[in-house]
Amino acid sequence: MGSGFSSLLPCFNQGHRNRRRHSSAANPSHSDLIDSFREPLDETLGHSYCYVPSSSNRFISPFPSDRFVSPTASFRLSPPHEPGRIRGSGSSEQLHTGFRAISGASVSANTSNSKTVLQLEDIYDDATESSFGGGVRRSVVNANGFEGTSSFSALPLQPGPDRSGLFMSGPIERGATSGPLDPPAGEISRSNSAGVHFSAPLGGVYSKKRRKKKKKSLSWHPIFGGEKKQRPWVLPVSNFVVGAKKENIVRPDVEAMAASSGENDLQWALGKAGEDRVQLAVFEKQGWLFAGIYDGFNGPDAPEFLMANLYRAVHSELQGLFWELEEEDDNPTDISTRELEQQGEFEDHVNEMASSSCPATEKEEEEMGKRLTSSLEVVEVKERKRLWELLAEAQAEDALDLSGSDRFAFSVDDAIGAGNAVSVGSKRWLLLSKLKQGLSKQGISGRKLFPWKSGVEENETEEVDNVGVEEGVDKRRKRRKAGTVDHELVLKAMSNGLEATEQAFLEMTDKVLETNPELALMGSCLLVALMRDDDVYIMNIGDSRALVAQYQVEETGESVETAERVEERRNDLDRDDGNKEPLVVDSSDSTVNNEAPLPQTKLVALQLTTDHSTSIEDEVTRIKNEHPDDNHCIVNDRVKGRLKVTRAFGAGFLKQPKLNDALLEMFRNEYIGTDPYISCTPSLRHYRLTENDQFMVLSSDGLYQYLSNVEVVSLAMEKFPDGDPAQHVIQELLVRAAKKAGMDFHELLDIPQGDRRKYHDDCTVLVIALGGSRIWKSSGKYL
């Protein structure tokens, strides 16, 4: 999670670990550091990633991206912050968020397979009827991987070279340092919004958008450290997906995802490990977080579909609860009106000059140009002007001669006309008119000259209501919904989004049933946590869990006994004994102190979710009551002998008879009746955070194969706030799995994917630091 770079340097020298334990080792040379990145990193094991909100107090210590652009290259120097990035205490945009940082880690055991159905273009749109134009229809990468915006930092998990059982992030041993690495000195942040370095692959339209913004950032931050570009500590974007072909990498529709939020402050991340998927969406300005863990089974299509569509469906349902559209001002300001009027007058003059059959003299044209440019200077316009406007504002003598060699022409006729013109001014006005008319033609249909800047597609049609809408894209900004929130409506919105998403998935399964009947076998458990301020909304299906680590008062027998003795002593002092002098009590006597001793506190794990599996007697009873005619609905502690979970997303072969009948006989069940054997009805819960809550743990069921709730919280606390808690929990999981199998830690990791599923399941862990806790040092804070 990005510890200070000065504390990471000793960990590079892997050949002298024993010597470093007894004496401080010298810092390795720069060439040695570069050589440590020569070997490509294996991404099949998993990833470690973190997120730190850009709204955190940056005066405590610099962010990694800012720390390496200081003039003195000092890693501890707090750089001058960008204007507008720091919100004052009285700013209306400064919001209180219930979380401080996110630590995540994923480890895979199953083989990562490609999706069965690759094209889902119009299915989700028909099911959800979303006003945002459908869901994010594509996935993240072709294999185990992680992708996110600049506020997220990630690197693949690697075992230590000395077979010590400790993780590494790349060439750095993760047992000594936690979290992803920081960029090197002189490396300029490529983020234009969050100010945190980027260490995951980024492609598609979003990558082009960020590269265009890079020029602006270069103008503000000079490069220090020589002309030669230093190799970044994190892997380059092109080499992040090791061994993957570029054409096989499928990127998420980031523009559509950003459009659903309506703001540029959306920070997102998508990751996969085996059949597990993780999705994070953070709205920094609106102050809420969406975190989803999707634990798939029998194939990747169900969790992929959830990762592509569930967030957008829930976000659409939350309109009016968490966010709302800003109404456009119907009465523009006087300045804007004057600008439009002056531009209209200027265009009229240009048209008159271009269509005039009697060319004016150079002196008259110069005077006219002065009058036009002086009229435009009445109001200072900060907006960028068109090319023909800038050229027309220049003086005739100082302006660029557009016809010096008669080469500047839009056509052959223009060149001939310019050559026959009487004066240089006439040539210039003729060409400016052509340029202006050319730009005007682009705006006839109401679309801009560069449609890719605004995401306008050619196949979009203009809607009837044009208020704030251009080419089918709603230009109104989305803002945080003020006022109190009805928690029941929020939970209902989450449930509606899930219902619409599953309906779309089952419809897709039915459409491709003849060609891909195996899609009916695929399903997924899911866990979604929605946080807004101090309110947490949990939705789960299956056996994934959400825990809250909190301190509670531990009432021991000793503390109760001490309180009773104090009360008895006070009663004795209050008795009036006339035969004796009043008793003088020393205030230093702790036994009669008015204040009782502070109670002892203990860390407990509060489970916010409900398990849906055959291990829960209520779930088994429910299924048997729903299928009284089927005596074999639960076989071998599984639903129809197939699934351990009693509720799941997808898995249509246990929900619809026609989907079950399409399967091969070896996979087909004896379906009695038409009622589904498993449901997609989620468990919903609202929880209000308190000052005693330290962090929240979200994880798939693979974690609880070897760890209990209390052990998970205790392990996370060992590396909290000074380490990487999520990765520490994952490491302990693998250690216990290896110990149970009677093998070494590295022997377990040497087992290829697929075969390793015999010893442990795919596992994804998210540790969310809450507002009442300290943020861990490895996330870029020096406390």
Swiss-Prot record:
Catalytic activity: O-phospho-L-seryl-[protein] + H2O = L-seryl-[protein] + phosphate; O-phospho-L-threonyl-[protein] + H2O = L-threonyl-[protein] + phosphate
GO molecular function, one term: metal ion binding
Phenotype of null mutants: Loss-of-function mutant pll1-1 (T-DNA insertion) shows suppression of clavata mutant phenotypes. Redundant with POL. Pol and pll1 double mutant inis seedling lethal.
Superkingdom, taxonomy of origin: Eukaryota
Name of one Pfam family that matches: PP2C
Annotated ranges, domain PPM-type phosphatase: 260-770
Key words of the record: Developmental protein, Hydrolase, Magnesium, Manganese, Metal-binding, Nucleus, Phosphoprotein, Protein phosphatase
GO BP term, example: regulation of DNA-templated transcription
SMART domains: PP2Cc (SM00332)
Region Disordered: start-end pairs: 151-194, 555-595
SUPFAM superfamilies per UniProt: PP2C-like (SSF81606)
Record: residues binding Mn(2+) 1: 295-296
Residues binding Mn(2+) 2, per UniProt: 295, 701, 761
Tissue-specificity statement: Expressed in roots, leaves, stems, inflorescences, flowers and developing vascular tissue.
Needed co-factor(s): Mg(2+); Mn(2+)
Entry's localization field: Nucleus
Enzyme Commission number: 3.1.3.16
Principal location: nucleus
Enzyme class: hydrolase
Biological function: Involved in the regulation of pedicel length and of CLAVATA pathways controlling stem cell identity at shoot and flower meristems.
Domain-related comment: The conserved PP2C phosphatase domain (257-736) is interrupted by an insertion of approximately 200 amino acids.
Family: Belongs to the PP2C family.
UniProt-recorded name of the protein: Protein phosphatase 2C 29
Primary gene name: PLL1
